[in-house]
Swiss-Prot record:
Protein name (record): Basic phospholipase A2 homolog MjTX-I
Family: Belongs to the phospholipase A2 family. Group II subfamily. K49 sub-subfamily.
Regulation of catalytic or functional activity: Myotoxin activity is inhibited by suramin and varespladib. Inhibition by suramin may be caused by (i) distortion of MDiS from both monomers impairing the membrane disruption mechanism by the toxin and (ii) surface electrostatic changes of the complex that interfere with the toxin membrane dockage process (putative-MDoS is partially hidden). Inhibition by varespladib is probably through varespladib binding to MDoS.
Primary subcellular site in the record, as a coarse category: secreted
Segment forming the signal sequence: 1-16
Pfam families: Phospholip_A2_1
Functional summary from the UniProt entry: Snake venom phospholipase A2 homolog that lacks enzymatic activity. In vivo, it displays local myotoxin and edema-inducing activities and is lethal by intraperitoneal injection. The myotoxicity effect is weaker in comparison to other myotoxins, probably due to the formation of high molecular weight complexes and to the oligomeric conformation (conventional dimer). It shows specificity toward neurons and myotubes, but not on a variety of other cell types. This PLA2 excites a cohort of sensory neurons via ATP release and consequent activation of P2RX2 and/or P2RX3 purinergic receptors.
Taxonomic source organism: Bothrops moojeni
Subunit comment: Monomer in solution. Homodimer; non-covalently linked (probable conventional/extended dimer conformation). Homotetramer (dimer of homodimer (probable conventional/extended dimer conformation)); non-covalently linked. Homooligomer.
Cellular compartments annotated: Secreted
The organism's taxonomic lineage, starting at the top: Eukaryota, Metazoa, Chordata, Craniata, Vertebrata
GO MF assignments: calcium ion binding; calcium-dependent phospholipase A2 activity; phospholipid binding; toxin activity
Residues that hold varespladib according to the record: N43, H63, K64
UniProt keywords, alphabetically: Disulfide bond, Myotoxin, Secreted, Signal, Toxin
Length: 138
């Protein structure tokens, strides 16, 4: 079952260290990252771009902006380590870029948790992303 979940996360095309990001989102929100955020709003998941639909979607927009600021690592491929201590994400890298990558993922997971009350099922499977309005630059 766990292998199936990991494969599903990989197929969604979410950027970053997919396994770690997925775990963080699950730990912080209790929601399945693929089914809950894989195609949410204009910014969550694959092809994410556009003016955020709500605070949840804004978390994903800010996350993409965070990735754009990383210069010496590849958010789509590089892997990092973190731990879950006392219900808190602790990034554990000595490499500064991997630490920043982990912090980007940590921030989006916490943001999604803090905005669970704005989660709107009508944006859950938004496959009309090409019709999202252009967002302000990061």
């Amino acid at each position: 079952m766990r292998t199936l979940w990991i494969m599903a996360v990989l197929l969604v095309g979410v950027e970053g260290s997919l396994v770690e990001l997925g775990k963080m989102i699950l730990q912080e929100t209790g929601k399945n990252p693929v089914t809950s955020y894989g195609a949410y709003g204009c910014n969550c998941g694959v092809l994410g771009r556009g003016k955020p639909k709500d605070a949840t979607d804004r978390c994903c927009y800010v996350h993409k902006c965070c990735y754009k600021k990383l210069t010496d690592c590849n958010p789509k491929k590089d892997r990092y380590s973190y731990s879950w201590k006392d219900k808190t994400i602790v990034c554990g890298e000595n490499n500064s870029c991997l630490k920043e990558l982990c912090e980007c993922d940590k921030a989006v997971a916490i943001c999604l948790r803090e905005n669970l009350d704005t989660y709107n099922k009508k944006y859950k499977n938004n496959y009309l992303k090409p019709f999202c309005k252009k967002a302000d630059p990061c």
